[in-house]
Amino acid sequence: MKAQFNSINKSNQSIKLLANISNKSSTKINFQIYRYNNNEIFKYAISIKDSKIELNINLLKLLKNSFSNKLIGSFIYDISNKYSASQIDINTSNKNILENTVLGFSQKDFIYSIYKKNSQKSIYQTKFKLSKINSNTLQSINFLKELVSEPSNIIYPESFSVTVKKNINQSSVDIKILKKDKIKKIGLNCLLAVNQGSAKEPIVMEFSKKNHKKNVDILFVGKGVCFDSGGISIKPSAGMEDMKWDMGGAAVTASIIKYLSNIKTNFSFAGIVGLVENMPSSTAYKPGDIIKSYKGINVEVLNTDAEGRLVLADIITYGCEVYKPKVVIDFATLTGAI
């Protein structure tokens, strides 16, 4: 299906969607207010006649916030998808609004179906070229979605590190990959304990802006439990397939580093992710175990499904010691036993 985005020379701040739909019907929705977090963003009206749909969006004020513009694109995608629009034309009077509308639309238009016949990455095809910065944003967001969509037999600590390394611009970012022996030598014992039950070896990835000053401005930290069974304190089987997502924090960190590696920044940054699997086996760590953390604090394990804080405790402490950041931003999926 095709999507066409146009900037037209009009003085009013409005956006119009014209689309062909498969069903013949007649519907009219008078102007309603679209709100986000209780803020009024825009007014919209929908008219459907025969096999044509027309969506009119009137901005309540000129949107200076690009996020609000992206909300419009997301909304247009939802309407197009709801009515199975086969060919759409989107027209607006403002090139900047159009750019961010397209970005919001494209962020929604993502399908990960590589394991299916006739797989595709999106529903709509468009010739519209995003600016370099917005294209980089979209690619980084989609990279994140791809990482978390993969099953755990495809994305595990080592394969995660290989995939991420290939996707980061190493002319501007240095990457270190620490394997089990190095992790053990450093003393990231809590992270090692979580991975004890897995046949896969743990990995710690470090990223840093080339030629960064000693004390970085921002350190990004990500929890990367590539599969979380709960360990000896095993989770219920229902829904356990979703535990491939427990590396979401590491995926977010990697996608941010990917984005930053392709732009010029006026701040220094570093990133660190701890990649493990939390599996039950004869070698797994157990409730009642006592582990000495990287900081030297003894930690008693009461529930092996509370593994995320153990991984984070070690990599945050280690990352802060190495990079001495002014700000730490950590990303983690922490649920269940917390």
Where are these regions (language model features)?
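Glycine/charged-rich beta-loop-alpha catalytic/anionic-binding loops adjacent to active sites
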Residues: S51-L60, N142-E146, K185, V216-L219, ...
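Short amphipathic alpha-helical segment within the helicase RecA-like ATPase core
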Residues: M1-D217, V221-G224
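Buried hydrophobic packing segments
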Residues: I76, V252-L260, L312-G319
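Short acidic, glycine/serine/threonine-rich loops at helix termini
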Residues: L98-L103, G187-C190, G230-I234, P280-K286
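Short, conserved micro-motifs enriched in small and acidic residues
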Residues: S66-L71, I154-I155, M240-A251, L302, ...
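Alpha-helical metal-binding/catalytic segments enriched in His/Glu/Asp
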Residues: V164, I218-F220, S233-E277, G308
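A glycine- and small/hydrophobic-rich beta-loop-beta segment
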Residues: I263-A270, G274-I338
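Fold-independent oxyanion-binding glycine-rich loops
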Residues: I21-N23, L59-L60, L178-D181, F207-K209, ...
